[in-house]
A protein has these predicted regions:
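Mixed-charge (Asp/Glu-Lys/Arg
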Residues: 1-182
Length: 182
């Protein structure tokens, strides 16, 4: 619990990702999911890769590094996931700021770039994955690739409270006050 409290404090002091969000006249953000996706689409590739790095670190990965190189074979970064004191996995990741679907050829190309370099791969996109790409990612006999589409990416930002701040709203419970009418 203390670990999560410390992480929450650090996040509160961190620079927000969604600082460009548009607010309604009452100060409440409207349709924040599409706003966040629009913000991410405007980020340069290196910025989106650094966001992926931050998400992976917050999710428990260690030694997360962005390669930041052209000619990297589609590998945007790597990290280590320590499952327990005895087992860890080297994981490579690729980032795609897409409004469209990621195709199965892109999953195959990423897997080819991974060959002999990691135990697992992750492709993170602002878009979606075609059904064929999903099948390719989990193909028998091939290293597994985790697919994180735009919806799942937003869920991770929400859960980790990165670039998003939860807001509590209150509704009047009239029934409660009625008992004090007389």
């Amino acid at each position: 619990v203390k670990h999560f409290q410390e992480r929450r404090k650090a996040k509160a002091n961190a620079e927000p990702i969604a600082e460009e969000a548009v607010e309604g006249t009452d100060g409440i953000s409207r349709n924040y999911r599409s706003e966040v996706l629009a913000i991410l689409m405007k980020r340069p590739p290196a910025g989106f890769e650094r966001l992926a790095q931050r998400i992976l670190r917050e999710a428990g990965f260690t030694q997360v590094t962005v390669t930041g190189q052209s000619g990297d074979g589609g590998i945007d970064g790597f990290g280590t996931l320590q499952v327990n004191p005895l087992v860890s996995f080297k994981v490579l990741f690729q980032c795609k700021r897409y409004a469209k679907s990621v195709a199965p050829t892109q999953v195959r190309d990423f897997r080819g770039a991974m060959a002999g370099r990691a135990d697992k791969g992750i492709i993170i996109t602002t878009g979606t994955f075609s059904a064929e790409a999903r099948r390719e990612a989990s193909r028998d006999g091939a290293p597994p690739i985790e697919l994180i589409d735009g919806d799942r990416l937003l869920e991770m930002l929400e859960r980790l409270e990165l670039g998003l701040k939860p807001v509590t709203t209150y509704e009047v419970a009239h029934q409660f006050f009625r008992e004090f009418a007389a």
